Amino acid sequence: KKTMIFTDEDVRYLRMSKAILADQTDAILDVWYGFVASTPELVASFKNNKTGAPDAAYLAAVRKRFAQWILDTADANYDQAWLDYQYEIGRRHTNPKKNQTDKADSVPSVNFRYLSALTIPVTTTLKPFLAKKGASPADVEKMHAAWVKSVLMQTILWSYPYVREGQF
């Protein structure tokens, strides 16, 4: 949090964003899933090993968790339970835990480079949704900045399983 310059003000603006985003999660996910679907390198993480096509059931299961992740990010406590869950999310992107939660037959791991790279499309496309409910431009900017910090912090934590012991 210190390295990210993540402050109590950021937490306050994330909390403010929850009421704005709560009824927009489906629309947000439509944008994010559209981006993933149009990017072969990303959609490959959801392909069925037998058919080579994106696994619709797997995508739907992940979508439910992704909707909850939006709300959880806006309402996170940043305590030990939160930290432990971030590490679990990281493990679920890597072998051997990827595919276990959803019993999917897909690639064994999400390539490391996509974790932090996805911070940009996720947070950039979120900004218009933050502006939809009449928040002041200054509040939208502060909510957006808080989201950028939080998402990057989370993706850094998710990268833990990819990094050599002692190098994280």
Segments and roles (model prediction):
Residues 1-2, 22-129:
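Heme-based O2/NO sensor domains and their adjacent alpha-helical segments
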Residues 16-19:
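Short, motif-level signal for alpha-helix interfacial/capping segments enriched in acidic residues
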